[in-house]
Amino acid sequence: MQRSIMSFFQPTTTEGKAKKPEKEIPSSIREKEPPPKVALKERNRAVPESDSPVKRPGRKVAQVLSSEGEDEDEAPGTPQVQKPVSDSKQSSPPSPDSCPENSPVFNCSPSMDISPSGFPKRRTARKQLPKRTIQDTLEEPNEDKAKAVKKRKKEDPQTPPESLTEAEEVNQKEEQVEDQPTVPPEPTESPESVTLTKTENIPMCKAGVKQKPQEEEQSKPPARGAKPLSSFFTPRKPAVKTEVKQEESDTPRKEETKGAPDPTNYNPSKSNYHPIEDACWKHGQKVPFLAVARTFEKIEEVSARLKMVETLSNLLRSVVALSPTDLLPVLYLSLNRLGPPQQGLELGVGDGVLLKAVAQATGRQLESIRAEVAEKGDVGLVAENSRSTQRLMLPSPPLTVSGVFTKFCDIARLTGSASMAKKMDIIKGLFVACRYSEARFIARSLSGRLRLGLAEQSVLAALAQAGSLTPPGQEFPTVVVDAGKGKTAEARKMWLEEQGMILKQTFCEVPDLDRIIPVLLEHGLESLPEHCKLSPGVPLKPMLAHPTRGVREVLKRFEEVDFTCEYKYYGQRAQIHVLEGGEVKIFSRNQEDNSGKYPDIISRIPKIKHPSVTSFILDTEAVAWDREKKQIQPFQVLTTRKRKEVDASEIQVQVCLYAFDLIYLNGESLARQPLSRRRQLLRENFVETEGEFVFATSLDTKDIEQIAEFLEQSVKDSCEGLMVKTLDVDATYEIAKRSHNWLKLKKDYLEGVGDTLDLVVIGAYLGRGKRPGRYGGFLLAAYDEESEELAAICKLGTGFSDEELEEHHQNMQALLLPTPRPYVRIDGAVAPNHWLDPSIVWEVKCADLTLSPIYRAARGMVDKEKGISLRFPRFIRVREDKQPEQATTSDQVASLYRKQSQIQNQQSSDLDSDVEDY
């Protein structure tokens, strides 16, 4: 009969006779006595062995491999194959209610070796290994059967419901173990009679026997979530309370995750998007970078511009409502920038460094990564694939938008000999922490080629929608999540367009998100014009001119208004800013800070202004100047000048500033003033210096002959032609716009197309004959603003010198792609030998424009089925100051074609009338 453990520690009581010690029972009888079939631990509904801190020794070779102490392999609750001799197959440690007679750990019999002081002697595996008996041999098949049962149960586990958390799954398994049918054991004493308290007196010899498992427990590492040892010798009731507490602690965890879905399932492109309920993070938390990556994925999957804007807008709405401090980093990551252009922060990580970082972070061979990049043509996809195949023992914390953006800025600011190693460490750290598609877009951002088709105007449109639909500045929980709700589709569209114009106009005057975003979050979108105004130090996007084909077109357009003609100088745009403190800044047409490029110009600023002038913004053209001959030098001479950190004493190419507009003066913006007033203030407050600072040569006239003569003279004076501008009517300075109030007239316009075109190089053809081994032709494309795609327009092969072809061939090796970018459209054009990353802009001249069934540019704008191509295109120069998004658009191509047709028709009609009159 199985007895409780207390019977071995208690003296004879009045309730019954004292039981004889176990040692008095002959061993032969003890072997024949059947063991208990189920441990009392299970019968008392105690925790399973898997949760018990009392584990069996991990080193199997140190266990006694006899019938008294077999190693246990069965899982908790698994039906045991009973032995006729030993009960040591139970997986759980001996419970306090029973003392297995043959247990090697809790052997309560005096037959155990005991020292004279009453403590059990130390037993070693080698000394205690008994000889194998026939009984052991007969028990081995039973062990094999039990292990087979265990294996089948492991291979066919019960799948818990998907809604259960990890803690609930464990509890469910425990309940299944407890509910398994068991053979009732022999009656024992009540739980109260077997409870061991601290106040009970235990004999020294018994205490010594009890102390052995405690010492073994102390020598083992603590189990996960280990409890005090005494808790495992208590009844089931406290264990139930513990489980209830665990379930209660798990309940708020499930409630927390209910409102914040997993970022892996985040979908900002869904219809009826809710900025709070559909977000994958909570109020006050940092925006996970995976949310931005998922947004980029959705944008990459579509080609419709409106859908792109809507998807990005949904993400921005959630950021505004939940984590407004992360709005600025999200916008810069969407634009693939690190700040305003004037800060000059660029990542500039080459593909070689990027591939090495991917290899070291993922453990792949560099050669295999390079081969995969050559095959796929996208370092981002290769990084994502390499990262997805790696498994980490301890995953890194999830990436956040602010964390990634900060790391990018750190990379851009690192300089010096050791900077490359530091950059490598930062990049490796980012890749190690990446999940899913995060590696793809981090790699693309680092390479400077995010290329989602998200132009600046699209990002601004998305920001305007987000700031309008989900107004910032609301206390959480946000009351208004969709301010456009209730409006008709047409009214909603017009309202969003008006809101977008407010933001775009503000951005034209203050193209600095660092200044705009704080104001937007504090005061709202409609208050931007009041708080964000034009000021020195913040570069403006310059006003641009439309081309014309001849003097007659100019007179026809400006028939009833006064206008002026100015020389069009062949140089680089230079926007001169002088702040109130006297600091001088010079910016390019792309808002890049060129102050370090022109130290000679900065030194002459105090001489060109009157003392009363404290601050101003001048629009000028920097032109190469020959001081000896006192004449303008060709544009190519200016391009040889050093670009950064120029020492004034080492300057060889001198420049002269030709000023033609004044936008800001002494704290007042002049952009709304007419040109006549701006020109007057320019000449009153500044002084000319020959060869250093000169006003643009101009002529106010409406006489066609005088304009023609003035045009001829401009060409003789090494200028491109004329700029014709209105003086009073519609004569404001339209920032960042190509206005019809400014017209450009070149000498070449009178012979053919009204303007040169700035086109993007998307492919290269290998040369033949005189040009073997290098590129002899190139495939060019125009930019489509509506779809934000590049559409092929012509093949170019003339206008190059041998030196230029060699230089182009070398520079383009770093731009090679196995396939074109997804936003490049060629249709029926002949595919080039090598595809190129579309990042180079060339200025091209042609004889005329023609309809083409092959090229896609401007398709559907003039003809439903045909596009427009160039006849006899010729290379002019590289436009280093332009990005692909600033290339000639399809609308401009169609406009040039229409003007060409109109003039041809007018000329033919004039000839017909002359013939009739003759």
From Swiss-Prot:
<dbReference type="GO" id="GO:0006260">
    <property type="term" value="P:DNA replication"/>
</dbReference>
<dbReference type="GO" id="GO:0003677">
    <property type="term" value="F:DNA binding"/>
</dbReference>
<feature type="binding site">
    <location>
        <position position="744"/>
    </location>
    <ligand>
        <name>ATP</name>
    </ligand>
</feature>
<keyword id="KW-0007">Acetylation</keyword>
<dbReference type="Pfam" id="PF04675">
    <property type="entry name" value="DNA_ligase_A_N"/>
</dbReference>
<feature type="binding site">
    <location>
        <position position="725"/>
    </location>
    <ligand>
        <name>ATP</name>
    </ligand>
</feature>
<keyword id="KW-0131">Cell cycle</keyword>
<feature type="compositionally biased region" description="Polar residues">
    <location>
        <begin position="100"/>
        <end position="114"/>
    </location>
</feature>
<dbReference type="InterPro" id="IPR012340">
    <property type="entry name" value="NA-bd_OB-fold"/>
</dbReference>
<keyword id="KW-0436">Ligase</keyword>
<keyword id="KW-0235">DNA replication</keyword>
<feature type="site" description="Interaction with target DNA">
    <location>
        <position position="590"/>
    </location>
</feature>
<dbReference type="GO" id="GO:0071897">
    <property type="term" value="P:DNA biosynthetic process"/>
</dbReference>
<dbReference type="GO" id="GO:0005634">
    <property type="term" value="C:nucleus"/>
</dbReference>
<dbReference type="InterPro" id="IPR012310">
    <property type="entry name" value="DNA_ligase_ATP-dep_cent"/>
</dbReference>
<keyword id="KW-0132">Cell division</keyword>
<dbReference type="GO" id="GO:0046872">
    <property type="term" value="F:metal ion binding"/>
</dbReference>
<keyword id="KW-0479">Metal-binding</keyword>
<feature type="modified residue" description="Phosphoserine">
    <location>
        <position position="801"/>
    </location>
</feature>
<dbReference type="GO" id="GO:0006284">
    <property type="term" value="P:base-excision repair"/>
</dbReference>
<feature type="modified residue" description="Phosphoserine">
    <location>
        <position position="67"/>
    </location>
</feature>
<feature type="modified residue" description="Phosphothreonine">
    <location>
        <position position="78"/>
    </location>
</feature>
<keyword id="KW-0539">Nucleus</keyword>
<feature type="compositionally biased region" description="Polar residues">
    <location>
        <begin position="1"/>
        <end position="15"/>
    </location>
</feature>
<dbReference type="Pfam" id="PF01068">
    <property type="entry name" value="DNA_ligase_A_M"/>
</dbReference>
<keyword id="KW-0460">Magnesium</keyword>
<feature type="active site" description="N6-AMP-lysine intermediate">
    <location>
        <position position="568"/>
    </location>
</feature>
<keyword id="KW-0547">Nucleotide-binding</keyword>
<dbReference type="InterPro" id="IPR012309">
    <property type="entry name" value="DNA_ligase_ATP-dep_C"/>
</dbReference>
<dbReference type="GO" id="GO:0006281">
    <property type="term" value="P:DNA repair"/>
</dbReference>
<feature type="binding site">
    <location>
        <position position="573"/>
    </location>
    <ligand>
        <name>ATP</name>
    </ligand>
</feature>
<feature type="modified residue" description="Phosphoserine">
    <location>
        <position position="230"/>
    </location>
</feature>
<dbReference type="GO" id="GO:0003909">
    <property type="term" value="F:DNA ligase activity"/>
</dbReference>
<protein>
    <recommendedName>
        <fullName>DNA ligase 1</fullName>
        <ecNumber>6.5.1.1</ecNumber>
    </recommendedName>
</protein>
<feature type="modified residue" description="N6-acetyllysine">
    <location>
        <position position="145"/>
    </location>
</feature>
<feature type="modified residue" description="Phosphoserine">
    <location>
        <position position="908"/>
    </location>
</feature>
<dbReference type="GO" id="GO:0051301">
    <property type="term" value="P:cell division"/>
</dbReference>
<dbReference type="InterPro" id="IPR000977">
    <property type="entry name" value="DNA_ligase_ATP-dep"/>
</dbReference>
<feature type="modified residue" description="Phosphothreonine">
    <location>
        <position position="798"/>
    </location>
</feature>
<feature type="region of interest" description="Disordered">
    <location>
        <begin position="1"/>
        <end position="271"/>
    </location>
</feature>
<dbReference type="InterPro" id="IPR016059">
    <property type="entry name" value="DNA_ligase_ATP-dep_CS"/>
</dbReference>
<feature type="binding site">
    <location>
        <position position="720"/>
    </location>
    <ligand>
        <name>Mg(2+) 2</name>
    </ligand>
</feature>
